Amino acid sequence: MTMFQKLVAIEPVSLIPSAEQELSRYAQQVELFADIPADDDEIVRRIGDADAVLLSYTSRIGREVIECCPKIRYIGMCCSLYSEQSANVDIAFAREKGIRVLGIRDYGDRGVVEYVLHELIGLLHGFGMPMLQDEPVEITGLKVGIVGLGVSGKMIADALAFMGAEVSYYSRSRKPEAEAAGMSYKPLDALLKDSQVVFTCLNKNVLLLGQPEFEQLGAGKVLFNTSIGPGFDSAALERWLDQPGTHFFCDTRAAAGAVAEGFFDRDNVHCQNVSAGRTKQAFVLLSQKVLANIRTVLAELE
C-alpha cells in the first residue's frame, strides 16, 4: 500500500488514541505536536520535509507556508471545511501546487442540539437562570425561527419540532423535505419579526444580521448563535441587547464576535465558553473522518 514518507500534525488535532496509532499505517514517520505553533515560521519548521500535514482550526496554512514546504502532497483539516473562502488553508494555492486538501463536516452536531435544548429549557422554566416569562412555559407552541437549514440547523429544527415548537426557517434555498415535515419557509425579515426564539446556524464568515435585521427582531426575543463565528454585526447585537426582554446565547465567546469589554457580564448574555460540539462521541467521529480522508488520498496516489 502507498504510504506517505512523513506525516506531521502541526498542533493538537483531537484524534482519539487509537486513531493516532493508526496513522503509522499510512506514513513511514509520524510526528504529532502537542501545542499550537506561534507563527508561520514555526509552522514551516514543524512541517519540514513532510509530505502530509494535519491541522485543526487553531492555525492557518497560507500561501507563504505552502511555498516554503515544497514536499507537501496532502493537507488534512481536522476541523470543519465549509468552503474554500472560509477555510484556514489556502486551498486555491494548494491546488495550483498539486496539493490535495480535505476537511471534514458534521461530526459535532448532536452535542450542539443538546446544548440548545439544555439552555432553552433552562430559560423557559427558570432552571439556573431568570425565567423568560412570569411563569414556566413549554417548548410546545413556541414560535422558533432557524436561520440556515444545513445539517445542524435541520437537527435543531427537528428536535424542537418534536417537542411541539412551531418551526419556520430561512435558507438560501427552499428545503422541500423540511416543508413536508411541517416547517414553514419565511423571508428573513418575516422570520425575525414572527419568531420568539431565533437560531443562527450559518457557515463560518457568513454575516446575515445587521442593524436593520435586529430592528426587525425587536424586544422580548431570544437569539441563539450555534455557528463557529458570529452570524451578525456584533455592534448591532449589543445595541439589540439593550432592549428589554432580550437574551443571547452562544457556547463559545468566539461566537459573539468582536464585542465590547464587559459584554459577557451582561445578565441577558449566556455563554458557557465551552464548545458544545466537542464531545467524546464527536472526537470518535472526527477521528474516523480524518482517517478516511487519508485513505482516500493514498488511494488516489497509487
Protein language model features and the residues they cover:
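Glycine-rich NAD(P)-binding loop of Rossmann-like domains
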Residues: G126-I156
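N-terminal glycine-/charge-rich "phosphate-binding" loop or analogous flexible N-terminal tail
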Residues: M1-A50, G164, S168
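A short helix->loop->beta-strand "cap" motif at the edges of active sites that frequently abuts
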Residues: C69-Y74, K97-I99, A165, A219-K221, ...
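Rossmann-like adenosine-cofactor binding region
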Residues: G48-D51, I61-V65, R174-G262
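Phosphate-coordination loops involved in phosphoryl transfer and adenosine-cofactor binding
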Residues: F4, I72, T140-K143, G220
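NAD(P)-binding Rossmann-fold cofactor-contacting core
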Residues: F162-E179
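Phosphate/diphosphate ligand-binding glycine-rich loop within oxidoreductases
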Residues: A50-M131
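C-terminal helix-to-coil terminal segments
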Residues: T2, S18-E22, R95, R100-V112, ...
